[in-house]
Swiss-Prot record:
InterPro entries listed in its UniProt record: Flippase_ArnF, Small_drug/metabolite_transptr
Pathway annotation: Bacterial outer membrane biogenesis; lipopolysaccharide biosynthesis
Biological process, per Gene Ontology: lipid A biosynthetic process; lipopolysaccharide biosynthetic process
GO CC annotation: plasma membrane
Name by which UniProt lists this protein: Probable 4-amino-4-deoxy-L-arabinose-phosphoundecaprenol flippase subunit ArnF
Entry-linked Gene3D superfamilies: 1.10.3730.20
Gene: arnF
Topological domain spans for side Cytoplasmic: 1-2, 57-76, 122-128
């Protein structure tokens, strides 16, 4: 059950990260504070997507809390690295994100996935 909550947390956090990235690229920069505040107060699509991203992070924290009640921290924490993989793939697949493929990034993703598999391999008890 802890693994399920952990996966929910990762998926929701990845979606929240994508939402925040979209909003950040469409809202005025925070260096133009009054323009940024005006855009938030207008509550247009970009501001709503920003709010959804923030709410997604909040929901992800709830799922993470449930994860830590059921799964060892050493395993749970490793799950968070899957978010990097999901966001990288989504940035290449979703229109308008302009994510680029590179062999170096693919190698990094392969390392992350290999590490996760090693961490989650069932342990066998050794007899001495």
């Amino acid at each position: 059950m802890g693994l399920m909550w952990g996966l929910f947390s990762v998926i929701i956090a990845s979606a929240a990260q994508l939402s925040m990235g979209f909003a950040a690229s469409h809202l005025p920069p925070m260096t133009h504070l009054w323009d940024f505040i005006a855009a938030l107060l207008a509550f247009g699509l970009d501001a709503r997507i920003l709010l959804l991203g923030l709410l997604g992070y909040l929901l992800s924290v709830f799922c993470w809390y449930k994860t830590l009640h059921k799964l060892a921290l050493s395993k749970a924490y490793a799950l968070l690295s899957m978010s990097y993989v999901l966001v990288w793939i989504a940035s290449m697949v979703l229109p308008g994100w302009e994510g680029t493929f590179s062999l170096k990034a693919l190698l990094g993703v392969a390392c992350i996935m290999s590490g996760l598999m090693l961490i989650f391999l069932p342990t066998t008890k050794q007899r001495y």
